């Protein structure tokens, strides 16, 4: 891991409701870049099926990137829950796993940038630099929102002809899409969600905070929420009919709602799962459509080997 975005040339935007953004971003990146990862079934470290030579970039905007994210990365790679790491409440075996994870991360080609006030020029420059020097295949931007640098940049470009938030964010979204295409990288960008969306249980582009113009340019749009009581009631017949989960746990605690899938056959899909926030272990449970009716989807395996993407 070095301090300082499936297919290439795409950009994906995922909206969620708390610091899950950063954890999901790091989990996605480490699944591609870490040479070894903890296997929960085998209870051991295994070689990353995606290979050992992939590289990626994380651009953070609201944390002391290294200090605050380091324990999260240890937890993801080792499978040891982050609270246990921070509280130093570890067994001897868990301590050994943490030490192994630290060594693995030293050999991981994941680069971290911290810029809470980025503009479009910075994104082009930074991502191009890492593409040229480190051949990155994926970028995670955590997260997108209006800031003074973006506003100033847009004002100069438009000669102060009036500045609206939706215009600035639309320009940002268009440029992120162009970056993905021209630099041949997969970009996953995160936003916050609106309070109104939480109250109204919106699970589509209406949940995107800042501007509805943002989803216009993305290839894949996802909203992530913990299921509400009302949603759990809607899927209760499904829960009653299946036997899945961790032990006796069958109730999902996370739902990924796909509100956009450009060029894809499957649209308006909800993936229900169980997410351990301590180490980001995730178990897919089942899928439904927007009417909360269960549907079957054939799995597709995506691998990134030596920065080349294949599917099966």
Predicted ranges, named:
Residues 2-190, 196-197, 206, 257:
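Glycine-rich nucleotide-phosphate-binding loops and adjacent flexible coil segments
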């Amino acid at each position: 891991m070095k301090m300082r975005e499936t297919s290439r040339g795409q950009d994906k935007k995922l909206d969620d409701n708390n610091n899950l953004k950063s954890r999901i971003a790091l989990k996605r990146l480490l699944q591609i870049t870490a040479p070894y990862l903890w296997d929960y079934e085998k209870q051991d470290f295994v070689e990353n099926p995606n290979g050992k030579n992939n590289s990626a970039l994380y651009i953070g905007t609201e944390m002391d990137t290294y200090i605050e994210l380091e324990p999260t990365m240890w937890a993801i790679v080792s499978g040891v829950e982050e609270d246990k790491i921070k509280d130093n409440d570890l067994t001897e075996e868990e301590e050994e796993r943490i030490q192994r994870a630290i060594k693995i991360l030293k050999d991981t080609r994941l680069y971290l940038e911290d810029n809470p006030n980025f503009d479009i020029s910075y994104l082009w420059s930074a991502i191009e630099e890492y593409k040229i020097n480190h051949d990155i295949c994926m970028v995670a931007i955590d997260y997108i929102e209006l800031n003074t640098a973006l506003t100033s940049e847009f004002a100069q470009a438009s000669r102060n002809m009036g500045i609206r938030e939706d215009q600035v964010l639309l320009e940002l979204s268009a440029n992120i899409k162009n970056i993905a295409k021209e630099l041949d990288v997969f970009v996953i960008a995160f936003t916050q969600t609106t309070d109104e969306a939480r109250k109204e249980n919106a699970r589509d582009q209406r949940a995107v905070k800042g501007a509805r113009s943002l989803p216009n340019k993305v290839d894949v749009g996802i909203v992530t929420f913990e299921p509400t009581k009302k949603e759990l009631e809607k899927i209760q017949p499904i829960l009653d009919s299946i036997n899945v989960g961790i032990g006796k746990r069958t109730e999902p605690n996370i739902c990924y709602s796909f509100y956009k899938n450009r060029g894809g056959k499957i649209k308006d899909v909800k993936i229900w799962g169980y997410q351990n926030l301590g180490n980001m272990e995730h178990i897919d449970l089942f899928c439904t459509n927007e009417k909360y009716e269960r549907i079957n989807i054939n799995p597709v395996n995506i691998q990134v080997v030596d920065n080349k993407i294949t599917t099966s």
